[in-house]
Amino acid sequence: MKSILLIGLGRFGKHIALELNRMGHEVMAVDTVEDRVEALLPFVTNAQIGDSTNEDFLKSLGIRNYDVCIVAIGSDFQSSLETTSLLKELGAKKVVSRAARDVQAKFLLRNGADEVVYPERMLAKWTALRCP
């Protein structure tokens, strides 16, 4: 079982939280939208409403205590980039960040991401492989 910090609880982040819960991991879920946080409370170990671009807020989460930090913010690349950078500065062991385009991935990797995922590309490939 791993301890995972998940930031961003939109469609992608919500499904990550549910899958991590199914796998038995401890998940701390964070979003700025109260309804998203409340909807996932039954499925995560803990959840907080907060701004992940705020260094003091991130410090309060105890970043070094997590095995993996996932940045699943999809609608605001600037926030994703700032969050990724702050996580690494605060001692995150591993940061996995979401990107939609190659240029975003380059910025994320240069600013602290250990890995970048492309949800839309990954799903498109998975779907295409299932076509006869």
In which residue ranges do the predicted regions lie?
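Cytosolic regulatory regions of ion transport systems
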Residues: 1-132
